[in-house]
Regions:
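Non-heme Fe(II)/2-oxoglutarate
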Residues: 1-65, 83-85, 188
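Catalytic core of non-heme Fe(II) oxygenases with the double-stranded beta-helix
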Residues: 66, 70-146, 156, 163, ...
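Double-stranded beta-helix
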Residues: 170-201
Length: 201
């Protein structure tokens, strides 16, 4: 993909990033499929277990092994250069993630340049103190982050030469066909379904 970027679909038309280059990867390619199955989906599964296994059994809802399956929605490469940025946004699906591949030496924690930022709910209340409002992540090649798709996040621009490469993806959790939802108990009957609909004039 890096040697011939034009051969891969331009992903920028559907993404928020104002980046030099964003290219879709084909999930059916053997290397991408292996990465997805052995690293990305496995990472999402570990994230689910880390969170859900701390809950009592009655609080785990559908997140019981065997009741759901994870499926990759899309995966793409990001190339960020000097001045490029990714504004605050969210993703579709259930989980999103990023793998940092290449980071210029000047992105080193001495400033917020090139850092991934997770935004908290305080962001929407301008009068609140900014304590704990944002969590900055210094990118390092090989680091891998997974987060809920609804989590607002952004990427800061950086100064100087070099390229910041990352791999991003979205995953959806679906119920398995062998485990249908149990019937709900004590269902309420809607009164509106028991009377005739309104007639037009």
């Amino acid at each position: 993909v890096l040697q011939n970027p034009e051969a891969s679909t331009d992903a920028s038309i559907r993404l928020a990033g104002q980046l030099n280059q964003q290219r879709e990867l084909n999930p059916t390619q053997p290397a991408v499929r292996e990465l997805c199955e052995s690293v990305l989906l496995e990472g999402c599964e570990r994230w689910i277990r880390h969170v859900i296994d701390q809950q009592p059994p009655q609080g785990r809802g559908p997140w019981v092994p065997g009741r759901y399956q994870l499926r990759l929605i899309d995966i793409w490469l990001n190339c960020q250069m000097e001045g490029d940025y990714n504004p605050m946004h969210t993703h579709g699906g259930s989980f999103s993630g990023v793998v940092f591949l290449k980071v210029p030496s000047q992105i080193n924690g001495s400033s917020f340049d090139g850092q991934l930022c997770f935004h908290g709910p305080e962001e929407y209340h301008l009068q609140s103190f900014r304590t704990g409002m944002a969590k900055y992540v210094l990118p390092s090649p090989g680091d891998f982050y997974i987060f809920p798709a609804w989590q607002p996040h952004s990427v800061m621009p950086f100064r100087g030469s070099g390229e910041r490469w990352s791999l991003a993806f979205n995953v959806v959790a679906q119920p398995t066909s062998g485990h249908p939802r149990p019937p709900e108990q004590n269902q309420n009957i809607s009164l509106s379904s028991q009377r005739p609909g309104a007639k037009g004039l």
